[in-house]
Amino acid sequence: MTTASPRRALDLVFSPAPPPARAGGIGLTVLRIVAGLLWLAHVWWKVPPDFGEARRTGLWFWTHLAVDHPVFPPYSWLVEHLVLPNFTPFGWLVLVVETLLPVLLLTGTAVRLAALIGIGQSLAIGMSVAQAPNEWPWAYAMMLGIHLVLLLAPSAQYAAVDAVRAARIGGDPAPVARRLLGGWGVILALIAILAAVKSLGDELLAPRGSGVGYPPLQLFLGDYNMLAAM
């Protein structure tokens, strides 16, 4: 028993055989959740109603980079002549799409649809900013690769609404649903506890509550006053 675990660990790393299905499923689930958190970090600075157009900041600034530093000239032409003249509707569309993406990925709902949307968004962002100063084009290639994996590989076997939907086809979905709801209950309870602790001493209905997350890694889970935490 004492040698089995190290041997299995070595086999997992060095064996040419595929990893166990469970390990692969868990790894893909982690990749899906990380992708969801990535999109969640993209949402907070897309601020309506003008999305930075008046001050030439925010989404307007990053969108205009497609014109200032073209990656694919036909795309830059579309941005200049179609997107920028209709920027407010475009901003709302981006906000809706990039709010929907993390919701679908983090909850594991319609993951393949989310992956397709993620591929489209990754392409659009990459063609807008990949040639801008201080940008790293390979970051957008990795975003495309991540969503391609999520499209083609089973990344919704665990911690996913899609797993409940799949269980309905093969049998009883209740155990899978209970595990999913229990996991989300624990996560939401932890967020509520953190928000309540950070809001101690604030007014119950403070207009802007304390943020929950880790700013150095651009991980934001929302702002909560004491009432919202409760």
Predicted regions and their residues:
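Extended, low-polarity transmembrane helix blocks
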Residues: 2-96, 107-230
